[in-house]
Amino acid sequence: MEWETIIGLEVHVQLATNTKIFSGSSTAFGAEPNTQACAIDLAMPGTLPTPNAEAFRFATMFGLAVNAEIGKRSVFERKNYFYPDLPKGYQTTQLAEPIVGPGYVDIQLADGSEKRVRIHHAHLEEDAGKSLHEDFHGMSGIDLNRAGTPLIEVVTEPDMRSAEEAVAFARKLHSIVTSLGICDGEMSQGSMRFDVNISVRLKGDEKLGTRTETKNLNSFRFMERCIEQEVERQIEVIEDGGKIIQETRLYDGETHKARSMRSKEEANDYRYFPCPDLLPVMLDDDFIDAARAAMPELPDARQLRFEESYGLSPYDAGIISADAATADFFEAVAAKCSDAKLAANWVMGEISARLNAEEIRITAAKVSAEQLAGLIARIKDQTISNKIAKQVFDAMWNGEGDADTIIEAKGLKQVSDSGALEKMVDDVMNANPAQVENYRKADPAKQPKMLGFFVGQVMKASKGQANPQQLNDILKKKLEN
């Protein structure tokens, strides 16, 4: 039997407003528990919410970025359920008339193909608080600092057919909201959380299978593993004669396993009704036009510009343009060193490797764009080789100064003096007469590989500082005489 996977996503995007969606409380991350929740956030008697205009502006920008219809009239409703970190006993959200209507996002896959993922809608809502379980033996604590933080929840159509497609969409969405500046994208801090709806059906069937929802995934790696495991589990259950239960599941990032939390609720279970404390919000054309005018360059447009202006390949341009901060860093390096391709190679290579190893963002890189451009300039003018450049980069990352300072202090300048190189080549050839004879008698097709021995010996003698191109030219000339 051949199975088909059906995936839809619900993505919670925390908006980067300074205050909450219905109150003036701060949204800053990392404050002491319960120091940023006011009477409005807790729905104390006598309080009334006031909508945050910035949240509406951010949601409008998002809608425009994903080719969606903007709801000029949007209505808030109460979603009623009990949970300890939901102090009101309901969540203020949108259902019937959301601010963002149908739209779409185009994603690129590893094989070079493109796919369109439809967005059903996106709505504004308030976040809940946070339950804390680790610091309280036998009990749980509640931190309400997050309660009332503005979110947009993005709901897709079930258009994705694999973990690869779901992760590609999630990455693209992350790229869009961070480029817009409406979300900081810090997934480890809960700024973006993904709920994954998964079902399977036999290839060719039209009817959707019973779905499960796995909640609050906060990394692309977790999402990929979770989807692959859940698809495998569902297929195994069905092939063994069982039935999939519609349920909500929770993925544990430490054990990399998902477990059942509860049966999956339907909208009716939440008893939605219009919020009596909030009037419908009406957006006029001027508001929408102002939001459009404030939008920065989006990832797709940036990728195309990088291909056309800098001559980057679609792959390189796509990688660099996906993150706004990385794109800015690259452009700063390229402008200072006048070699976009070398700049791209170093940003995607050494810089990216260090950022991943230290789990930091490029805004915290220990080598500035100006310093990296200085290093590339020394490669271009042949002061140092690519191999030596990596040593210099290591020293720069460790705070030992700029490229020129390190090259001078460590004596790393490339040996480009032809007389000095010829002497080193002569010394190596005199010390290895048998290898010289073998080279001269060898089939020409084998000589390039044999040349590597002599290159290695001279590089060893020069402590890696011989100019590779000049060295190759001198060796070939002398060995062929």
UniProtKB/Swiss-Prot annotation:
Top-level taxon of origin: Bacteria
Catalysed reaction, written as an equation: L-glutamyl-tRNA(Gln) + L-glutamine + ATP + H2O = L-glutaminyl-tRNA(Gln) + L-glutamate + ADP + phosphate + H(+); L-aspartyl-tRNA(Asn) + L-glutamine + ATP + H2O = L-asparaginyl-tRNA(Asn) + L-glutamate + ADP + phosphate + 2 H(+)
Keywords: ATP-binding, Ligase, Nucleotide-binding, Protein biosynthesis
Disulfide bond annotation, renumbered to this chain: none
InterPro entries xrefs: Asn/Gln-tRNA_amidoTrfase_suB/E, Asn/Gln-tRNA_Trfase_suB/E_cat, Asn/Gln_amidotransferase, Asn/Gln_tRNA_amidoTrase-B-like, GatB, GatB_C_1, GatB_Yqey_C_2, Gln-tRNA_amidoTrfase_suB_CS
Matches recorded under Gene3D superfamilies: 1.10.10.410, GatB domain, N-terminal subdomain
Enzyme Commission number: 6.3.5.-
One GO MF term attached to the UniProt entry: ATP binding
GO biological process: glutaminyl-tRNAGln biosynthesis via transamidation; translation
Keyword Repeat among UniProt keywords: no
Top EC group: ligase
Pfam families to which the protein is assigned, alphabetical: GatB_N, GatB_Yqey
Keyword Coiled coil: no
Stored SMART domains: GatB_Yqey
Assembly and oligomerization: Heterotrimer of A, B and C subunits.
NCBIfam families hit by this protein: gatB (TIGR00133), PRK05477.1-2 (NF004012), PRK05477.1-4 (NF004014), PRK05477.1-5 (NF004015)
Assigned protein family: Belongs to the GatB/GatE family. GatB subfamily.
Record's function text: Allows the formation of correctly charged Asn-tRNA(Asn) or Gln-tRNA(Gln) through the transamidation of misacylated Asp-tRNA(Asn) or Glu-tRNA(Gln) in organisms which lack either or both of asparaginyl-tRNA or glutaminyl-tRNA synthetases. The reaction takes place in the presence of glutamine and ATP through an activated phospho-Asp-tRNA(Asn) or phospho-Glu-tRNA(Gln).
PANTHER family named among the record's database cross-references: GLUTAMYL-TRNA GLN AMIDOTRANSFERASE SUBUNIT B MITOCHONDRIAL AND PROKARYOTIC PET112-RELATED, GLUTAMYL-TRNA(GLN) AMIDOTRANSFERASE SUBUNIT B, MITOCHONDRIAL
Protein name: Aspartyl/glutamyl-tRNA(Asn/Gln) amidotransferase subunit B
Source organism of this protein record: Teredinibacter turnerae (strain ATCC 39867 / T7901)
